[in-house]
């Protein structure tokens, strides 16, 4: 069930972030991503509380990404990791270029 839950959300080749809103790392990751203007439907925030039991979901994250913690961030079906990974990409000033290259940002 966890596999289906996750894979359905990754199917549209968008930016997907799995979060728990009480997690400060999740809020920080959302702050980074919210600096960008995404195309409609190209960015999805998934609260892991939507899935029960949560441990099954975390086990599946570990299976496919190597980590159980949130946030779990995907560009398309590719996991980029968690908050520290996103922060590193952002600090290298590469995040905007990556998001643009995968076609999820609005163009003016």
Curated annotation (Swiss-Prot):
Q: What is this protein called?
A: Glutaredoxin-1
Q: Which PROSITE patterns would you find in this protein's record?
A: GLUTAREDOXIN_1, GLUTAREDOXIN_2
The record's function comment reads: Displays thioltransferase and dehydroascorbate reductase activities.
Q: Where in the cell is it found?
A: Virion
What top-level branch of life does the organism fall under?
Viruses
Major localisation:
virion
Can you list the disulfide-bonded cysteine pairs? 23-26
Ranges where the Glutaredoxin domain occurs: 3-106
Could you tell me what induces this protein?
Expressed in the intermediate phase of the viral replicative cycle.
Pfam families named among the record's database cross-references: Glutaredoxin
What Gene Ontology molecular-function terms does this entry list? glutathione disulfide oxidoreductase activity
- Homology family: Belongs to the glutaredoxin family.
Q: Which organism is it from?
A: Vaccinia virus (strain Copenhagen)
Listed A to Z, the keywords are: Disulfide bond, Electron transport, Redox-active center, Transport, Virion
A GO cellular component annotated for this chain's UniProt record is: virion component
